């Protein structure tokens, strides 16, 4: 297994400038990413005591009023939910999507190696057609195949990744027939699924970096939105303000603010696979 230094997207550079956030550590942005040891709790409201009730001689139900009016209770704050999804590290340079899938399957007791899962992604090894300013004009279709070399470089680029239809197909093939996937998921839907105990694989940028986005035309004509920091992780928990991330880049687990997550999530058109 490769070290964290050798794994995917540890350091990205455009024009010689390091992309801050692409290697975001737990000591940076403490208000954004919380360690998994941080706890969350919801206060339990105290309800007023009910008044006594009786029946008078006329057969009419009477109620003894309480000493204070009963207030209208606010909607309860959602509790923090964590899902015991195993944390794995990607075993190849660019197989983050495969490793995130492996985590989702393992939660349901389905143990499949990354190499076996990756074999089902039918990598398209044709090189890209590059344009000006280090942009990609033409390349493969990650909606149908893994694009490029899995142990290549996503900056050169000689390798890229794979998108939700391939991951969904593999999830169903290996024992989760009710898994669903797609794009355009509202963040509220993702949070509801997590609250229900369903791990969710999402597409973001590495360490939630903010980097330029582009689009290439696949060999079959499909328009592909891409980023040189494309990454995939498994969400394994939700609180009123944050989501918990199982990050296969270096087998870490941490919390990130919902607002920060939602910005990154939108970069790949709210792409997700829900494991259920």
PLM ranges: what are they?
Residues 1-2:
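N-terminal Lys/Arg-rich, disordered targeting/topogenic segments
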Residues 6-10, 15-164, 206, 213-219, ...:
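Active-site-adjacent structural segments surrounding the nucleophilic cysteine of cysteine proteases
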Residues 100, 182-184, 204-208, 237-239, ...:
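A mature extracytoplasmic/lumenal domain signature
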Residues 101, 105-110, 122-123, 172-176, ...:
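Sec-exported extracytoplasmic/periplasmic mature domains
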Residues 162-163, 167-180:
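Mid-length scaffold segments of soluble, non-membrane domains
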Residues 171-172, 195, 214-227, 233-276:
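Noncatalytic regulatory segments and standalone regulatory/sensor domains
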Residues 186-190:
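Surface-exposed ligand/attachment interfaces on beta-rich extracellular proteins
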Residues 196-200:
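Loop/turn elements at helix/coil->beta-strand transitions in domains of secreted/extracellular proteins
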């Amino acid at each position: 297994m490769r070290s964290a230094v050798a794994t995917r997207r540890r350091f990205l550079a455009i024009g010689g400038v390091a992309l801050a956030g692409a290697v975001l550590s737990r000591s940076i942005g403490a208000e954004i990413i919380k360690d998994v040891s941080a706890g969350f709790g919801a206060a339990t409201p105290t309800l007023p005591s009910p008044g006594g009730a009786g029946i008078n001689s006329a057969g009419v139900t009477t109620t003894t009023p309480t000493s204070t009016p009963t207030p209208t209770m606010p909607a309860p704050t959602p509790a923090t939910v964590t899902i015991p999804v195993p944390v794995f590290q990607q075993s190849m340079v660019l197989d983050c999507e495969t490793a995130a899938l492996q985590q989702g399957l393992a939660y349901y007791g389905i143990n499949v190696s990354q190499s076996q899962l990756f074999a089902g992604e039918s990598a398209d090894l044709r090189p890209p057609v590059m344009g000006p300013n280090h942009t990609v004009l033409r390349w493969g279709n990650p909606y149908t195949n893994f694009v490029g070399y899995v142990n290549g470089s996503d900056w050169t680029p000689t390798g890229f990744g794979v998108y939700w239809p391939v991951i969904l197909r593999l999830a169903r093939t290996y024992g989760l027939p009710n898994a669903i996937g797609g794009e355009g998921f509202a963040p509220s839907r993702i949070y509801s699924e997590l609250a229900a105990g369903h791990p969710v694989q999402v597409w973001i940028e590495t360490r939630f970096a903010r980097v330029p986005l582009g689009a290439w035309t696949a060999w079959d004509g499909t328009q592909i939105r891409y980023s040189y920091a494309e990454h995939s992780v498994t969400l394994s928990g939700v609180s009123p303000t944050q989501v918990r991330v199982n990050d296969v880049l270096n087998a870490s687990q941490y919390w990130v603010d919902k607002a920060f997550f939602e910005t990154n999530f939108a970069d790949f058109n709210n792409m997700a696979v829900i494991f259920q």
